[in-house]
Amino acid sequence: MLSSNYSTRKVCHLCEAVKYGAGPPFDDFGAGACHRNTSRDHNSYMLGFATPPPLSLIPGFQLCMLVCDPMHCLHLGVLQWAVGNALVLLSGEGRWGVFEGQRKHKLDKSLRVAYSEFQPWCRCRAISTSQPVFTANSVNRGESPNYFPEFKGKASNTRWVTMWLCDVLYHIGPRTEAALFWGLCEMLHIMHVFPGPWLTGRVAQRFARACRVALLSYGCLARAAKADCLPLWGVKPKHHQLDHLGEVVARTHLHPGYAWAFCDEDFNGRICKVAAACMHPHVFSLRVLEKYSLKVWLSLEDARTDSVNPPWKT
């Protein structure tokens, strides 16, 4: 099932975008992209299945309940591809020195120099990370130079590496990669600094604009690499999903990270910390789950009353 889903032409539950063949291309991020005219509603979504998926059989299920997980879409998706490509590209340009030897050996040495710059950048800003030293393996170039780069790291570590690379590219000068990382860092800034669950209209438009700048820049780099037959800047379905996230934020003013607390890793981690403080740490207490759910609900209610009104109340 996973293999068939991975190789399917259609990549989106919100529109008719496809990877290849007839249909709106999923890697078009322009304002006039064809897939923007093929939005699905709940009924058209359900008609696309020969056998309804189990999730859709839950009473009250609606398509709008399928929300974008910002951690897996942005931090563990788009950011990691952008960071991996930028590290490989800057190393190839000699940004961190020119070394002799095999390609992997040269990349390893260059990335170690890059890591030696990343560490003091973090210390100067009182940032604590658990990111190990950069190597060819950490950008998916350890086994073959023909693999598309992808940074391997935790979500929080990837965030800080992205912001460091934004500084590096800013000091190098104007280039498409700098525009890409500006857009990514602007989205990160809004997600981690502005309170939720609702954004003001101005901030929501800022997020949508940064998302559009980042995706258009990435698409431009991807087309240039494809024209030169280079294994760089591969476009994935998560880029398309991020495009939809920018539209949703602009339309609803809903904070892009409002579902963050319900991500599975975050949820499990919090539950384990709470359960460890209980009298019976090896027993998963329903009461613990209820208390955590109540705490999350109360925090969302406080944020809602302290921020702007929801769009339907304005």
Model-derived segments and spans:
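Charged (Asp/Glu and Lys/Arg) segments that form or flank catalytic channels of large polymer-
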Residues: 1-172
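Terminal interaction-prone segments of large eukaryotic proteins
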Residues: 142-144, 149, 153, 157, ...
